Amino acid sequence: MIVQHNLSVSTRGRGTYGITAEIEQAVRRSGIRTGICHCFIQHTSASLILCENADPMVRRDLESFLARLVPDGDRLFEHTDEGPDDMPAHVRAILTKMDLTLPIRDGRCALGTWQGVYLYEHRTHPHHRQVILTLMGEPG
């Protein structure tokens, strides 16, 4: 069985946005008991990450690290038509991930105790992002 589901996420600018609950809901609705959930973001300046969900400082530290690694307004970037955060957002998205594959076991995503799925917005302004969930597996 293969099921697809679209997930829309409105961001308020740069940062991480938890989407684990929405993915879990799609898995439950699919009826798949054993399989995989592939998550793909349809954008080049946002990404998907699997990160610790208990301590928000982990995500803040990640943002601080990426800000040092790929600063906004770097004069070496030529692609600046949409502002000083545009090209750095593309680089950050490439350095993180645009897709994740999660195992489904017993009708749920088999995540670790402290794992959560996050949409990581790399632009400084709000955006509407689309994530395609493709669920494949055996129904219960």
Where are these regions (language model features)?
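Active-site histidine-anchored catalytic micro-motif
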Residues: M1-G140
